[in-house]
């Protein structure tokens, strides 16, 4: 059986004790952790689903990290073992993968905070800090919150190129040494090469710089240079969500600074194109214009700054005349189709312009007592519809341009390609 972990305890236990066998393969989807809503006797310390076989164990991310596969298997972080229900049908254990076993398949319900076994229909539960499965009982021991252990990519991959060129006017950029996927690999400067996957990165919404080599491999601070407290090498490491040493920002001087050491920025030591190895470092720039510490994100995306902003939620209408106004306007605008008009903003099969007219012409019914609340909701929905209409128009215009370009045959396409120097 396996246990949950009190993150205040300490000791070392391997995930690979008392494990069974049989095998095939299943590709992991993403790393995650599961925290129990059960508080325990102290009512303070949170508990996590852990691979440890003892209650007193180290609070390390590796034994709290699991890999969810597309088909519902929950792997250990090493990828060698999966969660299964024991032969007795009660306790949960770690075994090797058997794709034909339904008791190794789980469904994570993030809405209701449940983890259900598909073999017997029972739910992940806690029995004296041991992990088991049991029929649904409504207890906190069956409630789990899950969260990602890996960054969520934004989709915009590119190079971090130095603004300084070598003597032959070649660009150089951040590179994982030998394209290694191993943790604690040095990050160095290499000449930028097309499709060199070890040079391709992206900055995630939480400030990590993610390598294209692996979905869980990020830029991190490496060892100190000669014991210095202001000069460090850079390397790669496993993603840690709240580790400021792994989080970065870009300032107005095109410097990449570290969130833990905000006065230190990424630069390099050596002569580009001359020295056999040019190490990337985290150090103090000599000035705001120190070109060894200035970077170009290539390619750049005009929407990067917009889509990386924290989304501003719509005003929530949950009760009273605000909710009544929202539901009335939704029904009126959609001719009774829905009382939640926001659910249709992304639909391409409805006329948002028609909805806008209906909302604009609506008058406050007698069932709604606050005309002020009604007016506020009405103006808010009109603004939201205006935004949605304009965003859709941008993509419609692009689609129209794209279609007309190809409808003219190859001539326009060839001329355009020549114009932007791709042929």
Swiss-Prot record:
Q: Annotated region Disordered: where?
A: 1-27
Q: How does it sit in the membrane?
A: Peripheral membrane protein
Keywords for the protein's UniProt record, in alphabetical order: Cytoplasm, Lectin, Membrane, Repeat
- Enumerate the SMART domains for this protein: RICIN
Give the subcellular location: Cytoplasm; Membrane
Signals that turn on the gene: Induced by high levels of extracellular Ca(2+).
PROSITE patterns named in the record = RICIN_B_LECTIN
Gene Ontology CC, one term: membrane
Q: What does this protein do?
A: May play an important role in stabilizing and/or regulating the cell membrane during Ca(2+) stress or certain stages of development.
Q: What is this protein called?
A: Calcium up-regulated protein A
Classification lineage: Eukaryota, Amoebozoa, Evosea, Eumycetozoa, Dictyostelia
Gene expressing this chain: cupA
């Amino acid at each position: 059986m396996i246990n949950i972990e009190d993150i205040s305890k300490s000791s070392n236990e391997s995930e690979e004790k008392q494990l069974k066998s049989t095998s095939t393969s299943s590709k992991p989807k993403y790393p995650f952790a599961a925290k129990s809503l059960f508080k325990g006797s102290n009512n303070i310390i949170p508990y996590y689903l852990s691979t440890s076989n003892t209650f007193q164990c180290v609070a390390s991310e590796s034994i709290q990290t699991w890999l969810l596969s597309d088909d519902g298997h929950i792997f250990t972080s090493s990828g060698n073992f999966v969660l299964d229900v024991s032969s007795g049908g009660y306790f949960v254990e770690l075994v090797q993968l058997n794709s034909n076993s339904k008791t190794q398949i789980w469904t994570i319900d993030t809405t209701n905070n449940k983890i259900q076994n598909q073999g017997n229909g029972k739910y992940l539960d806690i029995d004296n800090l041991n992990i088991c499965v049991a029929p649904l009982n409504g207890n906190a021991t069956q409630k789990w919150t899950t969260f990602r252990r890996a960054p969520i990519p934004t989709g915009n991959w590119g190079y971090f190129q130095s603004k300084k060129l070598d003597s032959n006017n070649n660009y150089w950029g951040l590179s994982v040494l030998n394209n290694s996927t191993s943790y604690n690999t040095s990050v160095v400067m290499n000449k930028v090469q097309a499709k060199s996957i070890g040079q391709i990165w992206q900055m995630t919404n939480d400030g990590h710089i993610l390598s294209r080599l692996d979905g869980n491999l990020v830029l991190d601070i490496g060892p100190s240079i000669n014991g210095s407290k202001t000069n460090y090498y850079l390397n790669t490491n496993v993603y840690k969500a709240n580790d400021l040493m792994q989080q970065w920002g870009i300032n107005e001087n095109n410097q990449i600074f570290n969130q833990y050491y905000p006065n230190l920025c990424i630069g390099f030591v050596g002569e580009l194109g001359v020295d056999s190895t040019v190490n990337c470092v985290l150090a103090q720039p000599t000035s705001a214009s120190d070109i060894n510490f200035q970077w170009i994100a290539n390619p750049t995306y005009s929407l990067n700054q917009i889509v990386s902003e924290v989304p501003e939620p719509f005003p929530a209408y949950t009760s009273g005349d605000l909710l009544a106004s929202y539901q009335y306007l939704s029904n009126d605008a959609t001719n009774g189709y829905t009382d939640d008009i926001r659910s249709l903003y992304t639909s391409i099969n409805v006329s948002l312009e028609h909805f806008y007219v209906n909302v604009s012409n609506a008058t406050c019914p007698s069932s709604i007592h606050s005309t002020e609340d009604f007016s506020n909701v009405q103006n808010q929905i009109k603004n939201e519809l205006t935004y949605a209409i304009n965003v859709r128009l941008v993509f419609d215009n692009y689609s129209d341009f794209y279609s007309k370009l190809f409808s003219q045959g190859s001539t326009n396409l060839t001329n355009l390609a020549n114009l932007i120097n791709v042929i």
